Amino acid sequence: MVPTVWNEDADSMNQYSETFLDHYRRPRNLGDLVDSDAVAIVHNEICGDVLRVAIAVEPDTEAERRRIIAIRFKAYGCAATIAVASVISEMVVGKRVADIDGIDNDDVVAALDGLPAGRIHAVVLGRTALREAIARLS
């Protein structure tokens, strides 16, 4: 999967912050993670967006102490899905798995310097994919 081409007119681009546009145009952590510990694929049945998230964690005998050491994503979706997945991927590297639930929608929106209300579905999709990947850790 690769990011989709977003065919929006210039006026619609004005509703997004420079931070958002940077993450959309140059997504961080895009691609495959060969040595992943867990993978999740989630689908938004309303808009059709699909997001695949793969994570690798440091080994530790206590699950709650493990830290995310790498994350990669692939997205088929709108610009918001791509930008959100990119910013979430930056937010979680180095964090303990137990602390990930502390990241909420507002944190993601703030990291993007704002997001139109009509695009919040992308934040929900991104957080859901991450939570599902974490749930698949053994």
Q: What is the predicted role of each segment?
A:
Residues M1-P3, T81:
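Short intrinsically disordered, low-complexity coil segments enriched in acidic
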Residues D22-A70:
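Structured beta-strand/loop patches that form or line metal/cofactor-binding pockets in enzymes
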Residues P3-G31, V39-A40, K95-D99, I103-S138:
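C-terminal binding/interaction regions
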Residues E8, E18, E45, E58, ...:
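Glutamate identity and glutamate-enriched acidic tracts
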Residues A56-E62, R66-V124:
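Active-site- and interface-proximal helix/loop "cap" or "latch" segments in soluble metabolic
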